[in-house]
Amino acid sequence: MKKWTFDEAKEIFSFSFMELVYQAQTIHRANFDPNKIQISSLLSIKTGSCPENCKFCPQSSHYKTYVKKEPLMQIEDVITAAKRAKAAGSTRFCMGAAWRGPRDEDLKLVCEMIKEVKKLGLETCVTLGLLKEHQAVTLKEAGLDFYNHNIDTSEEFYNKIITTRTFQDRLDTLRYVRASGMKVCCGGILGMGETNDDRINMILTLANLEEPAESVTINKLIKIPGTPLENVQDIDPFDFVRVIALARIMIPKSYIRLSAGREQMSDELQALCIMAGVYSIFYGEKILTSANPMPERDNDLFQKLGIIH
């Protein structure tokens, strides 16, 4: 597996926009059907009161936001949501809990949720925070397909965004997930005040993992009132597309997922993202606690682009 250098990554990022998107689309076509997209759904199964201080997150207990604390959902309610997602066209169902990391007793309930969702024929992913090694094994034994744990940004910019857990903590969790035999879902957030070099370094970290993540989530910051990043300057849309193209070129076989922030994107920007290598979006009225494009808008966009899902 090729190990990329920063200079190599920066050279690619600095291509003319047309050349960069052309190369990304060429690699995308070699590995994926350019006229298809995977539909995923993401449900918050435990909301709010998270002890971490991630400056972007409305669920952090450190900030006063619109999010209300809600306990871990009942299994029956999760299954109802999963059935609804499948009926709407999702083939992948993700569950997220606002924890620093799960307690073993809570993990048992999550494992039951995973088993029931799997019975519906859906691919499963959960994001529960930091894991211990034995917890990763437990999730694998429950049949979990993917575990999501984002690095969020570059190692150099990380401490400007989060101080309650380290960048290495995140890498350790990814290592436990990989060792258990599960697939890794990992990405980050763009538009938190980081530089293009930080964005390049984030993709470089993902590309140079011992085994690259099978799933790479790219989020655009949703500026939430009450969080420290509510007034940060927006990322330039062309730089956003450049990061996606860079990820496609450096991590050619991974599913690149356009995640949070689509509600604030134009159809034209989303189309450019798909052209640059996105193969999956999160579908439904909400992504965790934040608004997502209505399904009708997504279906209209897919029809305009001739995309099958």
Swiss-Prot record:
PROSITE patterns with a match to the protein in the record: RADICAL_SAM
KW S-adenosyl-L-methionine (keyword) present: yes
Assembly information from the UniProt record: Homodimer.
Matching HAMAP family: BioB
Role of this protein: Catalyzes the conversion of dethiobiotin (DTB) to biotin by the insertion of a sulfur atom into dethiobiotin via a radical-based mechanism.
GO MF annotations in UniProt: 2 iron, 2 sulfur cluster binding; 4 iron, 4 sulfur cluster binding; biotin synthase activity; iron ion binding
Gene Ontology biological process terms, A to Z: biotin biosynthetic process
Binding site for [2Fe-2S] cluster: 94, 125, 185, 257
Pathway note: Cofactor biosynthesis; biotin biosynthesis; biotin from 7,8-diaminononanoate: step 2/2
Residues the entry annotates as binding [4Fe-4S] cluster: 50, 54, 57
Primary enzyme class: transferase
Family, as annotated: Belongs to the radical SAM superfamily. Biotin synthase family.
Catalyzed reactions: (4R,5S)-dethiobiotin + (sulfur carrier)-SH + 2 reduced [2Fe-2S]-[ferredoxin] + 2 S-adenosyl-L-methionine = (sulfur carrier)-H + biotin + 2 5'-deoxyadenosine + 2 L-methionine + 2 oxidized [2Fe-2S]-[ferredoxin]
Names of the cofactor(s): [4Fe-4S] cluster; [2Fe-2S] cluster
EC number: 2.8.1.6
Xref: PANTHER family: BIOTIN SYNTHASE, BIOTIN SYNTHASE, MITOCHONDRIAL
Domain Radical SAM core: 35-259
Keywords (A to Z) from UniProt: 2Fe-2S, 4Fe-4S, Biotin biosynthesis, Iron, Iron-sulfur, Metal-binding, S-adenosyl-L-methionine, Transferase
SUPFAM superfamilies: Radical SAM enzymes (SSF102114)
Cofactor note: Binds 1 [4Fe-4S] cluster. The cluster is coordinated with 3 cysteines and an exchangeable S-adenosyl-L-methionine.
Pfam families (UniProt xref): BATS (PF06968), Radical_SAM (PF04055)
Protein name: Biotin synthase
Domain of life: Bacteria
